[in-house]
Amino acid sequence: MPELPEVEVISNFLLDKIKNKQISNVIVNNWNLRAPITKNIDDMLKGKVIRNIKRRGKYTIWNTDGSMAVIIHLGMSGKLIYAEHDQAQNKHDHVVFLFSDNTSIIFNDPRRFGLVIVLNKEQEINFFDDFGIEPLTDEFSGDYLQELLKNKKANIKSALMDNKLIVGVGNIYASESLFRARISPLRPAKNLTYREYEKLAAEIKNTLSDAIAAGGSTLKDYAQPSGSAGYFQNNFYVYGKVQKPCKICNNIITLIRQNGRSTYFCNACQN
């Protein structure tokens, strides 16, 4: 599943390519994703101009004139594909956004766990109302993290992945951030020291920023709208490295399951 860095890369690409473009048509080939695509999406968006594109958590948001917002989540396998001319549609091209200059954005999602909805301004605010803090903001710090987690009994990795606490830090970047901070994913979130909260907040920011700079992580499905792959996976310390030696100490990387998710860590470096 694309996480914060991948969605940030996608949103930045789209901001450059489709901001101030007018939507001429929306073609829906499959209305049933994890939730139905907004009824009458074509009528709602035809003639609207994209005024801004931003990210919230793992969602990309296209704000249009008329105070409408296109909310897109890529699910497990979704992609947004940028085309500069008419492009033959593929089996899993569920939604095509056509622009007046004949460019288009295609939402492709083989597993159909994605989301494409249109909301007004008030609905957009309510949709994201219970989301946690954005980890790349100035507010996100050791002090903030300590206050946020001081009473949380859950293990620290699960806490980092709780969207109501912190948005966008999925399985990959939680594992990598904890390794960089040298903190075991098994530790209760409330039991870290202040210095550990401070270190972890910094390493979450560093890991996410490094991944964005690398274009995200391409493991299976993810690609940028241009078709280019990300390459942050080449810099992984622990994720997907089970039974391989740790890059720091040569200890063998361990794989466990936490809340149904794979967790990779070095039990020598992380404590």
Curated annotation (Swiss-Prot):
- Tell me which residues this entry annotates as catalytic: P2, E3, K58, R261
Is Protein transport tagged as a keyword?
no
- InterPro entries in the cross-refs: DNA_glyclase/AP_lyase_DNA-bd, DNA_glyclase_Znf_dom_DNA_BS, Formamido-pyr_DNA_Glyclase, FPG_cat, MutM-like_N-ter, Ribosomal_uS13-like_H2TH, Znf_DNA_glyclase/AP_lyase, Znf_FPG/IleRS
Q: Name one Pfam family in it.
A: Fapy_DNA_glyco
Q: What is its EC number?
A: 3.2.2.23, 4.2.99.18
What this protein needs as a cofactor is: Zn(2+)
- Entry keywords, A to Z: DNA damage, DNA repair, DNA-binding, Glycosidase, Hydrolase, Lyase, Metal-binding, Multifunctional enzyme, Zinc, Zinc-finger
Domain of life, source organism: Bacteria
Q: Which CDD domains match?
A: EcFpg-like_N (cd08966)
Q: What detail does the entry give on cofactor binding? A: Binds 1 zinc ion per subunit.
Q: Which GO terms describe its biological process?
A: base-excision repair
Q: Which reaction(s) does its UniProt entry say it catalyses?
A: Hydrolysis of DNA containing ring-opened 7-methylguanine residues, releasing 2,6-diamino-4-hydroxy-5-(N-methyl)formamidopyrimidine; 2'-deoxyribonucleotide-(2'-deoxyribose 5'-phosphate)-2'-deoxyribonucleotide-DNA = a 3'-end 2'-deoxyribonucleotide-(2,3-dehydro-2,3-deoxyribose 5'-phosphate)-DNA + a 5'-end 5'-phospho-2'-deoxyribonucleoside-DNA + H(+)
The protein's matches in Gene3D superfamilies, at most eight in alphabetical order, are given as: 1.10.8.50, MutM-like, N-terminal
Q: Which GO terms describe its molecular function?
A: 8-oxo-7,8-dihydroguanine DNA N-glycosylase activity; class I DNA-(apurinic or apyrimidinic site) endonuclease activity; damaged DNA binding; zinc ion binding
The record places its FPG-type zinc fingers at: 237-271
Coiled-coil regions in this chain? none
Q: Which family does it belong to?
A: Belongs to the FPG family.
Known partners and oligomeric status: Monomer.
- Which HAMAP family does the UniProt entry name for this protein? Fapy_DNA_glycosyl (MF_00103)
> What's the stated role of this polypeptide?
Involved in base excision repair of DNA damaged by oxidation or by mutagenic agents. Acts as a DNA glycosylase that recognizes and removes damaged bases. Has a preference for oxidized purines, such as 7,8-dihydro-8-oxoguanine (8-oxoG). Has AP (apurinic/apyrimidinic) lyase activity and introduces nicks in the DNA strand. Cleaves the DNA backbone by beta-delta elimination to generate a single-strand break at the site of the removed base with both 3'- and 5'-phosphates.
Protein name in UniProt: Formamidopyrimidine-DNA glycosylase
Q: Which gene encodes it?
A: mutM
